[in-house]
């Protein structure tokens, strides 16, 4: 509904300041409605999947989001070129409403009760207080914020970088963004399965650390390479590799957050996601400021460094074993 209203607003408002205020209001309300999506999905995975398959499931869910993001570049671009940006939002919102109706009809009405809920669980206020005393929560939130800083730079400034800095034609830039996002989605799916495999082979702590450090570290390396090559194809290939490796860690973040949270896994996932959104908010605003001082290469390299450092925080994160509730006491 809010997507449709975004397009409708463009028809009824012409003053730029009124349009800005309207967009802030509509998108803010959309954000409130969308906020439970990722934490809720991770909560459902934790309730319904065995521990050895949770990262795989979380990776597949987040990969689905990236497929949608990837299709926006050529899809919305074509709609805007063919119709208008207002109609693009109306059509996209209509498709989303139709899918929501189908989901409502086909999805199960309820979920099985999670296995770890007992009659002697502590009071809600005690669990929340104990959760926020966990160093694991703060460590994973900081790491996710640093990861999101790099990720959101690519989301919001990649088109500008291709079109204005590299002077790539619009249609080529859109398809480059499509393939880069598809690569990231593939990385999420592969990373989720790789996380479960690594945990089985190396143990939960070591396995997840290996995936997180490898994914964020290699993503930073290929991001650095992308700004040091010249051809359009080479830049696209390096950014695709960078985002594929970066995407590998999405499943391990969400799976670990719900493990840390225990009975408060929804809150833990939401808190981590808030930290990620803080990093994602700072990045699009700060990047052009940094680019004025260091150039776009410098701004991207700094984001790569932030993500790389964020990967090392995983050395401080200890994953609880299955059935162990860190905040039950």
List each language-model region with its residue ranges.
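Intracellular juxtamembrane helix-capping segments at the cytosolic ends
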Residues: 36-49, 247-261
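Extracytoplasmic gate region of multi-pass secondary transporters
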Residues: 134-189, 247-250, 254, 258
């Amino acid at each position: 509904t809010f997507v449709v209203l975004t397009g409708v607003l463009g028809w009824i408002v012409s003053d730029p300041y009124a349009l800005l205020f309207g967009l802030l209001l509509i998108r803010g309300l959309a954000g409130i409605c969308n906020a439970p999506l990722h934490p809720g999905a991770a909560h459902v995975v934790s309730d319904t999947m065995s521990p050895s398959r949770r990262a795989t499931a979380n990776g597949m869910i987040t990969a689905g989001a990236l497929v949608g993001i990837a299709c926006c570049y050529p899809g919305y671009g074509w709609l805007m070129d063919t119709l208008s940006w207002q109609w693009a939002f109306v059509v996209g919102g209509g498709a989303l409403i139709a899918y929501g109706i189908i989901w409502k009809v086909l999805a199960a009405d309820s979920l099985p009760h999670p296995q770890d809920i007992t009659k002697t669980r502590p009071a809600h206020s005690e669990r929340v207080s104990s959760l926020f005393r966990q160093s694991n929560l703060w460590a994973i939130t900081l790491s996710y914020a640093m990861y999101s800083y790099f990720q959101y730079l690519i989301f919001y400034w990649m088109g500008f970088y291709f079109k204005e800095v590299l002077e790539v034609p619009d249609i080529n830039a859109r398809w480059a963004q499509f393939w880069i996002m598809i690569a990231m989605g593939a990385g999420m799916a592969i990373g989720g399965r790789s996380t479960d495999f690594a945990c089985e082979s190396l143990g939960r702590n070591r396995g997840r650390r290996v995936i997180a450090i490898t994914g964020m570290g290699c993503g930073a390396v290929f991001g650095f390479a992308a700004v040091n090559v010249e051809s359009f194809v080479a830049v696209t290939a390096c950014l695709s590799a960078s985002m594929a490796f970066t995407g590998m860690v999405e499943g391990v973040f969400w799976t670990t957050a719900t493990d840390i949270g225990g009975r408060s896994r929804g809150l833990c996932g939401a808190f981590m996601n808030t930290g990620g959104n803080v990093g994602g908010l700072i990045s699009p605003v700060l990047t052009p400021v940094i680019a004025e001082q260091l150039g776009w290469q410098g701004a991207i390299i700094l984001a790569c460094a932030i993500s790389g450092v964020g990967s090392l925080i995983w050395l401080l994160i200890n994953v609880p074993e299955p059935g162990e509730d860190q905040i039950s006491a």
